[in-house]
């Protein structure tokens, strides 16, 4: 790990207050689980020399897309972490998703897999498996899971702590993790140890059947039904848009209408408009105004904007996005702009 250095900066800073739970092997999550994937992204996407064993070109091609924006990560304590990124989006939730620091499997499973790949037993990617004529690793295949279990047993015997977790995980903590994952793999015959609401009970490749069971651990932070509000997306939709088809250059004009969200008249949304001339050059843009909480809106376009319009057709686009779902509804219309007879007479 390297320090931030001097005079480094980032466009965006995101702080996460992490909700931990137990892994499905019974071990509580901690920051070591979050740190290991960070290490892995950098280690396996960078090639020091031609004999570098911790490099996968297919993985690197995917990881580098995000890594070029990541400036650093800082853990304030075990569950509070700050991510520094050179990334911006008009929706803060998109930034939070982009910069997230999370783990989908325990660090000890990832470390065991890494050792197996470095030793040429498996490959992380399909392309490397083909090039090296070895198997492409899958956590759900029984023989692969047993290889991971055997590697975990070696790590326990060696009292191994990954270099990336030095001074973060003690030997005793590591052995406790190894024991838990060894037991899990022995009992379940696969190595998919998650932290979500469902766990894989068994897998029958011959019958193409996977059986899931609910993970009812008391540490899981979301009660039953917590996510039900997302079963039906509350998308915004233009129900009615009214505007004059023919307008006079230099005179104000208004667009009005109504929006529904999830089928109900609601104003909990963002409304944006854009107006273009006949050459598709942007004339003006702005935010619409909600008249009430029933989805009725008004867009006032001043005379300066209409004066900049082309004689003839000018296109406008309306975008409405509910605050419950990101996908916008789009409405397009045409203003036919005609000269102002008074202004023409004065000239």
Region locations from a protein language model:
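The feature preferentially marks the first beta-strand/turn patch immediately downstream
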Residues: 1-347
């Amino acid at each position: 790990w390297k320090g931030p250095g001097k005079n480094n900066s980032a466009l965006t800073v995101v702080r996460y207050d992490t909700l931990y739970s137990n892994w499905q092997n019974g071990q509580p999550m901690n920051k070591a689980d979050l740190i290991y994937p960070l290490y892995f992204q950098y280690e396996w996407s960078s090639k020091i020399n031609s004999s570098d064993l911790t490099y996968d070109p297919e993985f690197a091609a995917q990881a580098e897309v995000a890594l070029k924006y990541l400036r650093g990560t800082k853990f304030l304590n075990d569950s509070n972490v700050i991510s520094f990124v050179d990334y911006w989006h008009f929706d803060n939730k998109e930034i939070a998703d982009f910069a997230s620091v999370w783990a989908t499997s325990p660090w000890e499973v990832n470390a065991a897999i890494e050792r197996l790949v470095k030793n040429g037993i498996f490959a992380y990617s399909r392309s490397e498996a083909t090039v090296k004529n070895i198997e492409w690793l899958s956590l759900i295949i029984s023989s692969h899971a047993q290889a991971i279990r055997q590697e975990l047993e070696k790590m326990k015997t060696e009292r191994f702590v990954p270099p990336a977790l030095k001074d973060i995980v003690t030997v005793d903590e590591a052995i406790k993790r190894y024991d838990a994952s060894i037991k899990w793999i022995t009992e379940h015959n696969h190595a998919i140890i998650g932290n979500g609401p469902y766990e894989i009970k068994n897998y029958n490749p011959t019958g193409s059947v996977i059986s899931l069971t609910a993970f009812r651990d008391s540490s899981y932070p979301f009660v039953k039904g917590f996510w039900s509000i997302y079963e039906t997306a509350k998308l915004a939709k233009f129900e009615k848009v009214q505007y004059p088809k023919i307008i006079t250059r230099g005179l104000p004009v208004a667009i009005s209408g109504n929006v529904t969200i999830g089928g109900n008249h609601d104003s909990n949304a963002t409304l944006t408009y854009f107006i273009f001339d006949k050459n598709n050059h942007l004339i003006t843009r702005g935010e619409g105004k909600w008249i009430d909480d029933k989805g009725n809106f008004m867009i006032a376009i001043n005379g300066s904007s209409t004066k900049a319009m082309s004689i003839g057709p000018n296109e406008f686009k309306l975008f409405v996005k509910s605050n419950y779902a990101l996908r916008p509804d789009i409405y397009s219309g045409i203003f036919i702009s005609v000269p102002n007879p008074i202004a023409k007479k004065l000239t």
